[in-house]
Amino acid sequence: MNLKKYLSTAPVVATLWLFLTAGILIELNRFFPDSLFY
C-alpha cells in the first residue's frame, strides 16, 4: 500500500495533471487546428 501513498503525493498528481492537460491540448490542435488563435 506504499505505492498508493506515493501516487497521491502532490508532485506526482501535478505531473499527471500536466501530462493530461498537454495531451488534451495536443489532441484538440490535431482535430481543430488554429483553434487557439482567433
UniProtKB/Swiss-Prot annotation:
One of its GO terms (biological process) is photosynthesis. The chain crosses the membrane at residues 6-26. Pfam families: PSI_PsaJ (PF01701). It is a single-pass membrane protein. Keywords: Chloroplast, Membrane, Photosynthesis, Photosystem I, Plastid, Thylakoid, Transmembrane, Transmembrane helix. InterPro entries: PSI_PsaJ, PSI_PsaJ_sf. The keyword Chloroplast applies. GO terms for cellular component: chloroplast thylakoid membrane; photosystem I. Signal peptide: none annotated. It is found in: Plastid, Chloroplast thylakoid membrane. Belongs to the PsaJ family. May help in the organization of the PsaE and PsaF subunits. This is Photosystem I reaction center subunit IX. It comes from Cyanidioschyzon merolae (strain NIES-3377 / 10D).
